[in-house]
Amino acid sequence: LKTLLLERLDLTAGATGRNHGLLHSGARYAVTDQESAEECIQENMILRKIARHCVEETDGLFITLPEDDLGFQSTFIDSCLKAGIRAEAIDPKEALRLEPSANKDLIGAVRVPDGAGDPFPLTVANVYDAQLHGAEVLTYHQVTSLIKEGDRVVGVEAYDTQARQKKTFRSRLVINAGGIWGHHIASLAGATVNMFPAKGALLIFGHRVNNMVINRCRKPADADILVPGDTICLIGTTSSRLPYDQIDDMKVTPEEVDILLKEGAKLAPELADTRILRAYAGVRPLVATDDDPSGRNISRGIVLLDHETRDGVKGFISITGGKLMTYRLMAEWAADLVCKKLGVSQSCITMDTPLPGSEKENIDEISTKTWSKPNATQKASVGRHGSRVENIKLSDEYSSSLVCECEEVSIGEVKYAIDELDVHNLVDLRRRTRVGMGTCQGELCACRAAGLLADAHQCTDRAKNDLKSFVNERWKGMYPICWGDTLRESEYSQWIYSGVCGLEGGEECETK
C-alpha cells in the first residue's frame, strides 16, 4: 500500500499528546465497558512486547477508601477476570508496602497490570516505522476540503501552513482519523459522525510521588487515577462536555484544578504539598451512537465506519473512538478494511513486530551495551529513543553537553531530533526530546535550543519568533496553577526573557 499521512499540526498535537500516559490494563472499564476492557488488556500485553522503550511496567493498585463501598471490590475483581485482566485482592498493609505514597487509610486494594506509556516517543516510533515501510508523512498540512467525483471521494485539498500554499492529493481511499475533528472532516464528504467532545483536565506534578499507578476502586469518576510518568506524575482527569466550537481553545478552569487537587490528595496525601508544574486538557474523541446523540451511554470502544455502506459515500472510511491504549488495534481494523476494499490479501503483523527502538534488549541492557558506564544523560536518551540511540552522537564533550538540565537532554540528542525526526520548531522539539518539560518549563533551556534551531535553519529571526511562541505555550500551562514556587518561577522567567534578553510579545503558540 502506498500511504500518505496528513497532520494538521505536529504529531501528538491533539488528544494523543494530551492524555494520562496510562498503559491501561482495562480494569478501569471492566465493570462499565467490558468490550473496552478486553481491548485494553489485549493491547497492553502487545505494547509491552513491541514498544518496550515507550512503556514502563509499574503495575497498578485500585484502592478503596473509607468513604467508598468495599462491596464494589468483589464486583470489580469478577469483572476484571471476565475480561481477561489479572486482578488480585491484596492486604492493605501489603499495598502500602508496595506503594508507600498511597493513602494510609485505605481499607482495600486490588493489584492489576497497569503501567505507564509515553505517547510522544510511541508516536514517533510508529511514524518512523511507517516511513521505513514507504509511507509519506506531512505535518502542518490542514485538510480544507475533500475532492468528490459523483458519490466517490477521490482525494483531499490541504493547506501547507509552513509553505503557506494549497496542495491537492488524490487517492483510491481516504481514511478519516482526525479524532474529535473527524466530525468536521466527515461533513466535508457529506457524511455524519456524531462526536461528543468530552474535555478532560490534568495536573503535572514536579516529581514522582508514586511508582505504581494508583486508581480509586469505584466506577470511573473525576481525578481517580495517579500515573507515574518519566520524571513526574499526573493526576486526572475531569470530564465535561465541551461546545464543539471550543475544541481548539481549551482552558483549564480554577474549578477543575480544585477538583483534581482535592480528589488527588485522597489517593496520595503527599500531592497536597507537592509542587504542580502545569495544567493541561485534551478532548476525548467519543462517538455518540446514531440513536443516542446526547452521548449519555458512550463507550470508549473503537468505531470503524465504512461510509459506502453507511452513507452511500464511496472511497471514504472513518476510524475514531477508542483511546491511546488501543491505537494499534484501531489501525489494524482500518487497515484490514482498506486491504479488503483494494483487494490486498496480506495480514496485519504489527502485533508481533517490534517498533524502531524496541527491536533489541530493554533500555537498561541497551545502555550498558552502548556505553560501559552510562551516565544520566545517556540513560535518559535511551529511555526516549531505545536502540536508535546508537544514531545519536554523544561521544565528545560538546555533543554530550546539556541543553535541558531538568530532563538531561544533550546537544547531540537535539541535533539528532532536528536532522531525523521532522522538527520544525521548539514545540516539535519538546515532543521529541522533552526539552522544556521539566521543573523550569523551558526557563533555562529554551534559548539554548532556539540557538541550535537557528543554526540548523540558518535563520535567527525565525528562531527568535519561535522562542516567543514556545515561552507563551509554556505559560498557558502554568497560568492555571500559578502560585507558590510556580509563581516565583514564572516571575524569574519574565526577568530573564524580558529584562535580560529583551524578548517582548510573541505570536500565539501553534497548539492553542
Predicted features by range, described:
Residues 21-98, 224, 366-373, 489:
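Dinucleotide-binding Rossmann-like beta1-alpha1 core, especially the glycine-rich loop
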Residues 63-139, 145-152, 230, 289-302, ...:
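Flavin (FAD/FMN) cofactor-binding and adjacent substrate-gating region
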Residues 112-113, 156-160:
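Short beta-strand segments that buttress and anchor functional surface loops
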Residues 119-121, 129, 187, 192-201, ...:
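C-terminal catalytic lobe of FAD-dependent flavoproteins
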